[in-house]
């Protein structure tokens, strides 16, 4: 199966996606992608996007990459840390961003305050499902975490313009 070099409106590298797709099977498809590509939009309009989604499928496997902007203190860093310690979760760290693996999915949270001292978070999630997906497979979990990191860097830097987004390191998050 051929996975494009760029996915999600050509905004994310396809490498981690390739690691999640089977070698053979039905053709790769990108469906229902919105609010990932920034071309043709003003920076003010893009910064107001509160959520985005990209559905990818092929060979009986489906991926959902999504982000949302969390504000109002309903879900905080303390909640992220608590959920990362829950049974069945594995902590993730990408620089100052934190999150967790849960089943075959990855969740990363980037501090993205709109004012000094604000507690707003950017949540980026990757869900993996479909035929033959082993939720405990290290390669699946690692690729899902890598895709979440790619999406977190893109959304934090290019869409939400989060303070300190440039400090998010390249590469996959640390697992464990």
PLM segments and residue spans:
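A small/polar (G/S/T-enriched), proline-flanked helix-loop surface module common
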Residues: 1-159, 164-176
């Amino acid at each position: 199966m051929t996975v494009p070099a760029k996915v999600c409106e050509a905004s994310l590298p396809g490498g981690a996606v390739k690691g999640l797709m089977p070698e053979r099977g039905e053709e790769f498809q990108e469906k229902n992608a919105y609010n990932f590509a920034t071309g043709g939009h003003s920076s003010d309009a893009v910064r107001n996007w509160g959520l985005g989604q990209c559905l990818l499928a092929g060979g009986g496997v489906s991926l959902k990459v999504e982000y949302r902007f969390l504000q109002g203190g309903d879900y905080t860093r303390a909640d992220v840390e608590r959920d990362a310690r829950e049974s069945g979760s594995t902590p993730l760290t990408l620089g100052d961003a934190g999150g967790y693996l849960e089943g075959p999915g990855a969740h990363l949270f980037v501090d993205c305050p709109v004012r000094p001292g604000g507690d707003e978070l950017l949540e980026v999630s990757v869900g993996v499902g479909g035929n033959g997906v082993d939720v405990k497979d290290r390669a699946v979990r690692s690729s899902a975490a890598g895709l979440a990191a790619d999406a977190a860097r893109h959304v934090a830097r290019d869409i939400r313009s989060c303070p300190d987004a440039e400090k998010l390191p390249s590469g996959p998050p640390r697992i464990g």
